[in-house]
Amino acid sequence: MANSPQAKKRARQNERRFAINKARRSRIRTHLRTVEEAIASGDQAAATAALKAAQPEMMRGVTKGVMHKNTAARKMSRLSSRVKALGA
């Protein structure tokens, strides 16, 4: 257990950051799930709209340190290619 005042403060800050990051990760996953569902339904218009909504959310996660930038880029690339394939 944390003994020094500094360690106690860091523990409090870690709890707070964990809650914020957890909410942010959850919001990103929700957006990704809506894109996946739109792709599964075969509706390109809905999938494109969901992808446009998910992209800034993922980039915000990268900026805030919740997700690595290469992971976000890979997910966006794969999703956009799948959405594009719906129209072909």
From Swiss-Prot:
Residues 1-25, 61-88 are annotated as: Disordered. It holds the Pfam family Ribosomal_S20p. Gene3D superfamilies: Ribosomal protein S20. GO terms for biological process: translation. GO terms for cellular component: small ribosomal subunit. Keywords: Ribonucleoprotein, Ribosomal protein, RNA-binding, rRNA-binding. GO terms for molecular function: small ribosomal subunit rRNA binding; structural constituent of ribosome. Signal peptide: none annotated. InterPro entries: Ribosomal_bS20, Ribosomal_bS20_sf. Belongs to the bacterial ribosomal protein bS20 family. Binds directly to 16S ribosomal RNA. HAMAP family: Ribosomal_bS20. This is Small ribosomal subunit protein bS20. It comes from Jannaschia sp. (strain CCS1). The lineage of its organism: Bacteria, Pseudomonadati, Pseudomonadota, Alphaproteobacteria, Rhodobacterales.
